[in-house]
């Protein structure tokens, strides 16, 4: 799930924040997670370069837009923790006016900016990975659902409708659909939670409007409990995501109408820009 569905944002920060993670789990755990998050973005960049994948990877920076003074103080605590406990001083705090300059609208009181955040075209990245793997001799079987994983003394047996495969290791990369597999009860329970998300995308904006609304082309997410996130694509479409239908419906017009109101509130100059695409589905957190 989400291989081609998500917004293609690679943030170097968790929504919870490193200071909050450290308070609950300790500095060592938070430092490890901090390193893993930075490594993840670096790894994707290295794969894109090594495999020559055309997927619009670019480090335009990640902006977390605070919706309250309390949220801004939390971002400031995160910046301070990173500097003192991880020796990382890359991120900086923006005031209200600096944040407005970055976003062009909305009601943010400030923000967090990390230049290491990146954007990517997720479906083209997935296709590029498949092409690179096939070129290296990897066999990919589509339309072959895994029915069962059986752990054996020295291997794992993967059972499918077309036969079984034995391997030393099996990677369960099922994202939001892990609960449906039943592969590893107890091992993955409550570690991966599926949520429904909905996304809209405008038709291409004029160069002038695009330069006004997201001039630095940041990857942006806000700090609301049910957050909105947004970015601009290389062809000047704004992708804007948020909460999906709680029942899992992918065609709820009320959800899309809500997103259309929110995108205009965030980007007033977009006005009645036509929406070119709408989609919904599950992603994992």
Where are these regions (language model features)?
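Active-site substrate-recognition segment that forms the wall
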Residues: 1, 42, 50-59, 146-148, ...
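Glycine-rich FAD pyrophosphate-binding loop
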Residues: 1-7
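Dinucleotide-binding Rossmann-like beta1-alpha1 core, especially the glycine-rich loop
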Residues: 13-97
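Short connector loops/turns at beta-strand edges and beta->alpha or beta->beta junctions
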Residues: 14-19, 104-105, 235-237
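Generic structural signal for well-ordered, non-membrane alpha-helical segments
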Residues: 30-33, 37-41, 71-75, 118, ...
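Conserved short loop/turn motifs at secondary-structure junctions
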Residues: 61-71, 115-119, 145-146, 246-248
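Helical element adjacent to the flavin cofactor pocket in flavoenzyme catalytic cores
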Residues: 73-85, 106-169
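General small-molecule cofactor/ligand-binding pocket signal
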Residues: 91-95, 139-141, 274-278
């Amino acid at each position: 799930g989400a291989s081609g569905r998500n917004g293609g944002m690679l943030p170097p920060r968790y929504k919870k924040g490193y200071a909050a993670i450290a308070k609950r789990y300790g500095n060592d755990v938070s430092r490890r997670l901090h390193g893993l998050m930075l490594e993840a973005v670096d790894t994707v960049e290295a794969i894109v370069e090594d495999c020559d994948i055309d997927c619009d990877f670019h480090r335009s920076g990640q902006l977390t837009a605070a919706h309250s003074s309390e949220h801004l103080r939390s971002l400031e605590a995160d910046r301070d923790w990173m500097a003192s406990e991880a020796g990382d001083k890359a991120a900086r705090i923006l005031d209200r006016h600096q944040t407005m300059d970055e976003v062009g609208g909305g009601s943010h009181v400030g923000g967090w900016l990390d230049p290491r955040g990146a954007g990517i075209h997720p479906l083209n990245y997935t296709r590029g990975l498949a092409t690179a793997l096939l070129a290296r001799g990897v066999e990919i079987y589509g339309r072959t659902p895994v029915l069962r994983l059986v752990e054996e003394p020295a291997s794992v047996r993967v059972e499918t409708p077309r036969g079984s495969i034995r391997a030393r290791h099996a990677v369960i990369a099922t994202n939001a659909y892990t609960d449906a597999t039943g592969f590893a009860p107890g091992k993955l329970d409550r570690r991966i939670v599926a949520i429904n998300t909905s996304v809209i995308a405008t038709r291409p904006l004029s160069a002038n409007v695009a330069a006004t609304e997201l001039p630095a082309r940041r990857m942006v997410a806000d700090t609301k409990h049910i957050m909105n996130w947004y970015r601009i694509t290389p062809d000047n479409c704004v992708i804007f995501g948020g909460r999906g239908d709680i029942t899992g419906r992918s065609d709820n017009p009320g959800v899309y109408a809500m997103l259309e109101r929110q995108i205009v509130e965030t980007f007033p100059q977009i006005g009645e820009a036509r929406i070119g695409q709408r989609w919904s589905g599950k992603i994992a957190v």
